Amino acid sequence: MFLVTVSSSAALAAQIQQPKGLVSFDLRDKYLIVVEATVNGMGPFSFLLDTGSTHTVIDPNLARQLHAPVVGEASLTTVSDVRMDKMARLKEVRVGDSAASELGAVIDKMDQVKLKAPGVRGVLGEDFLSQFDILLDYKKRIMRFDGAAPAGERCRIETMGHYRGLTTTNRLLIEAEFMDVSGGKLQLQLDTGAKMPELFPVRNDSISAHPWAGSMAFSSGLNGTSIHSHATIRIGTTMVHDVDVVQSRRGVAFDAVGLLPVWIFKSIYISHTGGFVVLNPAD
């Protein structure tokens, strides 16, 4: 998950070409989606598809290979730190028949990403994905661009949030409720790059409190985190049972209370144009 704040005139508006068709993807560790993309007519290159990343990211070697011009800098916020990176301009990024042009891309080594998905050369973020309505089918390992919306409950998503007093864009924020305890609905980021549901430390400016107040048994996780076992999450009328939820102690917080992994649904239709998702749509 990357949250990018562009600090120069490098904020580039993607120009859209009409996409059609299905694209197959590789599923790593049962949750990470890796697709093949061409960039500036070169490739294909392996990219991690990450709805939790606000911007597309490429590694320095790919930037050099593409001769991508640097157009500014961007502040890259991850769940562990904040750093400044260069931003390049990509003439075109294409997945299957779906393409966006004049896309800004952060240049970053992506060390943590490459540990989880060896061989990837970049991350396709929401600045690219938000140009399309997308169906992700984890069972069939296919994605469809700009197909008709399937039947099913439409759960509202917010594509803008707030972080450190600034408006964030290219987001997929959705309300979810943890049924095991009281606390009401929380706004979580729908994240294809997340393995487990995760709650961040409570911020002073957070409008939502964490649902757990010692009422659930938990075990100690990695890095001092707490893992709440056998939780039930409700999104709209969709219930997801028996999931483990990480309560993180990471120092960096975001515009959402936590992360909601997309893979916990067998499929999902994301309508960026309509501002809704359909969870587990019928075939």
Predicted stretch roles:
Residues 11-283:
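Pepsin/retropepsin-fold aspartyl endopeptidases
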